[in-house]
Curated annotation (Swiss-Prot):
Disulfide bonds: none annotated. It comes from Gimesia maris (strain ATCC 29201 / DSM 8797 / 534-30) (Planctomyces maris). This is Hydroxymethylphosphonate dioxygenase. It holds the Pfam family HD. Its EC number is 1.13.11.89. Keywords: Iron, Metal-binding, Oxidoreductase. Part of an oxidative pathway for utilization of methylphosphonic acid as a phosphate source. Catalyzes the oxidation of hydroxymethylphosphonic acid to produce formate and phosphate. Can also use (1R)-(2-amino-1-hydroxyethyl)phosphonic acid and (R)-1-hydroxyethylphosphonic acid with similar catalytic efficiency. InterPro entries: HD_domain (IPR006674), OP_Dioxygenase (IPR052567). It catalyses: hydroxymethylphosphonate + O2 = formate + phosphate + 2 H(+); (1R)-(2-amino-1-hydroxyethyl)phosphonate + O2 = glycine + phosphate + 2 H(+); (1R)-(1-hydroxyethyl)phosphonate + O2 = acetate + phosphate + 2 H(+). SUPFAM superfamilies: HD-domain/PDEase-like.
Length: 201
């Protein structure tokens, strides 16, 4: 387990007796640990809610909406945020931490796009020369730390993943979810979707 993790999501969710309680515990964690700023525009929680809203208004599946809401859960768990001096100075692989912590409770339709949303940024930068210029300051800063341009072999490997299309969608929602002051539904809007995606009781 990554030594930077402040708390184990597995431990938190395992204490819940029902799927509904499990989602409530997850949302309480997000509420408690999501008030720090993701970048200069939005908090971690605001970013998650905006991403989920973009997914839902795009008529995404429940799994895609859940992945959008939880895609940065690794940042929540490792208390990564803009005010820390080391934030974006090193790559803590939040996508891997998040996917691993969610894997005991959600299927690959949720966890794999979360795992791939950072490679999806590298992929889009590699196949679309203009994509990088549209990224936020924080995403541009983290891009090189996360690997920079993909090789041809990495592009081919990414495209062979059955969830790569969803990962690209998630990346687009991620990029658009940084609007200061935007009013979107709160966490409870997504309780049904997230609970429906739980695979283990």
């Amino acid at each position: 387990m990554n030594e930077k993790i402040e708390l184990s999501l597995c431990d938190v969710l395992s204490l819940s007796k029902t799927p509904g309680e499990r989602v409530t515990s997850l949302f309480e964690l997000m509420q408690d640990h999501g008030q720090s700023f993701y970048d200069e525009s939005v908090t971690q929680l605001e970013h998650a809610l905006q991403a989920a809203h973009l997914a839902k208004t795009s008529h995404a599946t429940m799994e895609q909406i859940t992945a959008a809401l939880l895609h940065d859960i690794g940042h929540f768990l490792m208390d990564e945020h803009d005010e820390q001096n080391h934030f974006l100075a090193e790559d803590w692989q939040h996508e891997t931490v998040g996917a691993q912590q969610l894997a005991p409770f959600f299927g690959k339709a949720v966890t794999e796009p979360i795992f791939l949303h950072v490679p999806a940024k590298r992929y889009l930068c590699s196949v679309n020369a203009d994509y990088f210029n549209g990224l936020s300051r924080a995403s541009q800063r983290s891009y090189e730390l996360q690997g920079g341009l993909m090789t041809d072999a990495e592009i081919a490997e990414f495209e062979q993943n059955p969830f790569h299309h969803t990962a690209v969608l998630l990346r687009r929602w991620d990029d658009g979810a940084k609007v200061k002051g935007l009013k979107v539904p709160d966490l409870q809007e997504y309780h049904t979707e997230v609970e429906s995606c739980l695979e283990h009781s």
